[in-house]
Amino acid sequence: ALPIYLTKVFEKISTLTIDSYVDKVITEPLLPNIPTPGTVASEKHYADIDTDEMVLSNGVRVVLKSTDFKNDEIIFKAFSPGGFSVFSDEDLMTGKMAANIMDYSGLGNFSVIDLQKLLAGKQASTTPYINSLYEGLRGSASPNDLELLFQMIHLQFTASRQDAEAFASLMTQFRSQLENKSLS
């Protein structure tokens, strides 16, 4: 026989009307307003290392290298000098956590969960990073999802999201790691 408190719980539950779970899916596009494209200001080919360099109208320098490793994958890395080395002592810990916070917060109007739903079945990802000397973004995409990758890159720089719930979740994980570190 079940203990009395479990029997009461089952009796209470049997009287409740419980609605089925309805998944909330955002139907808006990732990037609602496509920005005006820039132009290529200059191009140069380096035959000795088989790369092409373009300087864009916004000053960004792009170096392209084709390989025969994987025909269905485009990998990128974007960076600028700086990293932890330019942080004040007071901001160092915050700076070290910044990339993780950005990664957990989603992009534009999309939480990280909404973004995962949008990206289901697609091959596109971006990850911000900060190390000792550089900060930047890395990622990859299939050729079919290249436009989506460019939208994600654009949003990383123009519409990074501040998500208090994601921040609280990440802080809980960090606290747990610190508490468990003393046990090992």
Regions found by a protein language model. Give the residues of each.
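Proteolytic maturation boundary segments
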Residues: 1-89
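M16 family metallopeptidases and their MPP-like homologs
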Residues: 1-3, 70-103, 107-159, 169-179, ...
